[in-house]
Curated annotation (Swiss-Prot):
Protein name listed in UniProt: 3-isopropylmalate dehydrogenase
Binding site for NAD(+): 78-91, 284-296
Subunit and partners: Homodimer.
Required cofactor names: Mg(2+); Mn(2+)
Pathway: Amino-acid biosynthesis; L-leucine biosynthesis; L-leucine from 3-methyl-2-oxobutanoate: step 3/4
Amino acids binding substrate: 98, 108, 136, 226
Chain sites annotated for binding Mg(2+): 226, 250, 254
Role according to the record: Catalyzes the oxidation of 3-carboxy-2-hydroxy-4-methylpentanoate (3-isopropylmalate) to 3-carboxy-4-methyl-2-oxopentanoate. The product decarboxylates to 4-methyl-2 oxopentanoate.
Location(s), subcellular: Cytoplasm
A GO cellular component annotation in the UniProt record: cytosol
Residues carrying the site annotation Important for catalysis: 143, 194
Regions annotated as coiled coil: none
Biological source species: Thermosynechococcus vestitus (strain NIES-2133 / IAM M-273 / BP-1)
Amino acid sequence: MATTYRIAVLAGDGIGPEITAVALDVLRAIAPRFGLDFDFVPALVGGCAIDAVGEPLPAATLATCRQSDAVLLAAIGGTQWDSLPRHLRPETGLLALRSGLGLFANLRPAKIFPQLLHASSLKPEVIAGVDLMVVRELTGGIYFGQPRGIFTTETGEQRGVNTMAYTATEIDRIGRVAFETARKRQGKLCSVDKANVLEVSQLWRDRLTALSAEYPDVELTHLYVDNAAMQLVRAPKQFDTIVTSNLFGDILSDIAAMLTGSIGMLPSASLGESGPALFEPVHGSAPDIAGQDKANPLAMVLSAAMMLRYGLNQPAAAQAIEEAITAVLDQGYRTGDLMSEGCTLVGCREMGNLLIKELSR
């Protein structure tokens, strides 16, 4: 008897519906082999929700997500909503969704596919074999700390204020996710901070060091964030799992992303302590190519694979999808963002068809 999973599907804006269709087809194709069944429940978020009901995260969408086993999100946003007040913009809907689901840990892998070594701006010998994971704290730090704002001083001068703060509980929570993630990978965890000048980073380092006693099988190291950024570009193969705060993780995960050469190959997962996790590609909604069958669906498909591995505990099914992607790339098929001499250009739908063909072998 098949195991049925209820999946909230948030196709979103721009290329979102196109890449979502491919990911769902891939999941349907692989389901019978692993005794799985999916109940896909569509819901609105972002610009399409604003157009439909006047707000970026309808209450019905949050309710649907909370009642699901996992949430699969494509992309949100577009220039037509940029002039709206901040609280009505698509991006606010995503922040509210993360908050509403209690998601505090963001996992972003950066893995180099051998077939795409040429796509990176770094030398092949520098990036060949890179396979790392950035674990970023999502709900604390300087993006959420209070007080914040732009104030006028007694002398009439404007002063901008943001507060970077973490509690020991918040640090321990993300630290445990990072140690558990590293334990399932190569057993190496690098904690990134700025403990030489920031008290909040001193606490971060102290808490991670204390936690390491519970994970003797994981090797813990520490780097200052400026050095970590340099090392990611100089010698990225030294890293396995990186854990860091919200701001530093925002920056470092984008650096790690470009090691791969294409943001169109990067999935992500956002996890909470309980309840459904959120899985989405790193790239945006790319409205300039929406509806033209030019989008690269592979980051979305890899997000579906992450959902299987981290959200539904189906690692074998996840691996099968990843192996299908490798096989299709081995055969020389590329979407436009990955195209190089000697390869065969395919569109979004055809890339999906090739994956399904590979999965049916």
